Amino acid sequence: MKKSAALGRLTALIITAFVDMVGLLMIIPLMPYYARNFGASALMVAMLMSAFTAAQLLAAPFWGRVSDRYGRRPALLVGLGAAAIAYVVFAFANTIWLLLLSRIVQGAGGGTTGVVQAYVADAVEPEERAKALGWISAATNVGVALGPPVGSFALKLFHVHGPGLIAAALCLFNIAFAWRYLSESRDMVEAKKVERRKGASLIAVKHVFTHSKEAAPRLIWVYAIGIGAFQGITAILALFLADRFGITADRIWVIFTFMGTISVITRAGVLGKAVDRWGEVR
């Protein structure tokens, strides 16, 4: 693939991932406050926050086959469409169960993270993938930094419906942008010739459990434990800050913006140089 074409595709992908994360992080910090308004317990809030990941995990094998068979672009557009629907449900939710439904719909729609990573694998040369993923991560972390204040200000200006509706509008913009500027990264003529082995996803998962001492499964375990710990903190952070320090929904953005800013500095300023100096494995 020509370098200019790969760069253009990567740029479009970075913008898509950034806008998607802004919409997501408009909602995540506010979700516990909305749930508490409906009388949810701390356990229910944690379940609510994890519903997206659980639904995404269950739907992942299906969307993996769709992505391989029909292309990355359609799978990404479906994920963005599911997110738009989920945000509208969130905006008008009047029970905890509708909040839960919004999370499940978004997760079952496939999300975007896996598809974005597959895009990078298709479009970028192997020696440049770590840097490309670093820039994608930096873009999403800029979204982490900017999404919470936008969500909190939307709540102030437009009340409870505002964050969900603005996040849905961002999703619709993102769909239009991706449709126009993000070309398919997979060679679909060749893809249709390749038959995906039945049960390949389950075999891969089993391999991670049964061959945990190998490099790839070990890396997956390290990542899973790290991201699991982070997500666990995120799920209860708003409740902890509200109970301990009286942080309200219109001020929670400060904490998430700080976290996102630190992540941007690490991913964009440190990761690429570290890979250049020590290599991907180290």
Located regions from the model:
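Juxtamembrane intracellular "pre-TM" segments in multi-pass secondary transporters
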Residues: 2-6, 183-221
